[in-house]
């Protein structure tokens, strides 16, 4: 198989596997009567992220449980989509949803083939550190390293360090995306992981489309805005160097679409909307901790547009707690201390002081 044919095959595989839970959520909501495109896209993104974090915890419980969960998520999504009878759903809304789906696939293909236009598919993760930028640290490999450990070992032992990084230092959502698709075919070179990483990073396109629809821009303006963002330095560098910043952006953008949309006055009194909003914010934090810098002003904007009810706030708090508490417990109990990035960014302190562990290379690190 030629390099380009292999890339195309992997691209289609990971687009389909990533999109299945999202498509099921959107079609089910449409069948139940929801017609708002921004809300349907927000639901789709939330379903995608929730499937990934569910897979992460299933693998952590036991690798066999994780693999069963991965197959059930994929096959269950296919069955659910069939049962939704898309041919009987609102064609006009389906056409509106097809546009961001097509742009997501197009954006993924653009980054993948631009990244490998000069070859390098035999060592993709190293290529990604220099392809569009000055040499970057190997942070793009961290989720792959820990995903392999959980895939083989679950919670049976504490994962070994990657360089100086503990498994608790970075949120687990991208690890979860890897684990959902690992059983369907993988490799040792990292090419599967790289293509999947690009596909997941490009979910920002769906989130941004939701924002542009909520802002009631015309289709031409939406297309121009998305195209400009796709070819920007941020879109290309962070799209190919697959650390999970753009995944987090997708969820924050979807939450923003809820706040700025014309339905906010109704949504701020709906517990279901509270659960969706909190899930998007929680998934953003489980993708990248820097999401807090977007979520805090987003909460201020939501309050300015109309304070939610106490019931809404309570529902949101419970959903956020359900998503974030297990990871916080893991950080504190399974692989402490879990706060090294905060100490580093605020206090300039990175060393692990209270334990000695062995890195994958076998050298002792303090």
Predicted regions and their residues:
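Transmembrane-helix motifs of polytopic, lipid-linked glycan transferases
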Residues: 23-27, 75-85, 191-217, 254, ...
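Perimembrane helix-loop-helix junctions
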Residues: 258-275, 293-321
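Transmembrane helices and adjacent periplasmic/lumenal helix-loop junctions
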Residues: 57-67, 234, 275-304, 320-331
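Membrane-lumen/periplasm interface segments of specific transmembrane helices
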Residues: 52-56, 312-366
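Membrane-embedded, hydrophobic transmembrane alpha-helices
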Residues: 1-117
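Short acidic/glycine- and proline-prone juxtamembrane loop motifs at membrane-interface regions
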Residues: 237-248
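Transmembrane-helix signature of polytopic, membrane-embedded enzymes
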Residues: 33-43, 188-195, 202-231, 250
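Specific aromatic-rich, kink-prone transmembrane helix
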Residues: 21-28, 203-207, 247-266, 276-281
């Amino acid at each position: 198989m030629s390099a380009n044919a292999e890339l195309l095959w992997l691209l289609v595989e990971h687009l389909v596997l990533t999109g299945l839970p999202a498509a099921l959520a959107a079609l089910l909501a449409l069948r139940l009567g929801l017609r708002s495109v921004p809300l349907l896209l927000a639901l789709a993104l939330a379903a995608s992220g929730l499937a990934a974090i569910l897979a992460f915890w299933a693998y952590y419980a036991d690798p066999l449980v994780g693999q069963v969960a991965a197959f059930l998520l994929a096959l269950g999504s296919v069955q659910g989509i069939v049962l939704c009878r898309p041919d009987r759903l609102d064609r006009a809304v389906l056409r509106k949803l097809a546009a961001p789906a097509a742009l997501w696939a197009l954006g993924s293909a653009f980054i993948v083939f631009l990244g490998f236009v000069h070859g390098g598919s035999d060592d993709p993760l190293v290529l990604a550190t220099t392809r569009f930028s000055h040499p970057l640290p190997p942070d793009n490999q961290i989720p792959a390293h820990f995903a392999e450990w959980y895939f083989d070992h679950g919670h049976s032992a504490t994962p070994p360090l990657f360089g100086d990084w503990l498994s608790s230092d970075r949120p687990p959502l991208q690890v979860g995306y890897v684990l959902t698709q690992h059983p369907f075919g993988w490799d040792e070179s990292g090419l599967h992981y790289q293509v999947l990483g690009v596909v997941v990073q490009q979910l920002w396109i769906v989130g941004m489309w939701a924002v542009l629809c909520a802002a009631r821009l015309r289709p031409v303006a939406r297309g121009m805005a998305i195209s400009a963002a796709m070819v920007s330095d941020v879109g290309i560098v962070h799209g190919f160097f697959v650390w999970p910043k753009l995944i987090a952006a997708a969820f924050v953008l979807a939450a923003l679409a809820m706040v700025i949309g014309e339905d906010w006055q109704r949504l701020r009194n709906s517990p279901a909307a509270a659960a969706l909003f909190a899930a998007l914010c929680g998934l953003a934090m489980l993708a990248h901790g820097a999401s807090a810098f977007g979520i805090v002003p987003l909460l201020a904007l939501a309050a300015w547009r109309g304070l939610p009810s106490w019931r809404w706030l309570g529902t949101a708090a419970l959903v956020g707690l359900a998503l974030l508490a297990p990871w916080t417990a893991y950080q504190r109990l399974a692989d402490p201390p879990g706060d090294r990035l905060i100490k580093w960014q605020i206090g300039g302190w990175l060393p692990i002081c209270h334990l000695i562990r062995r890195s994958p290379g076998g050298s002792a690190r303090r």
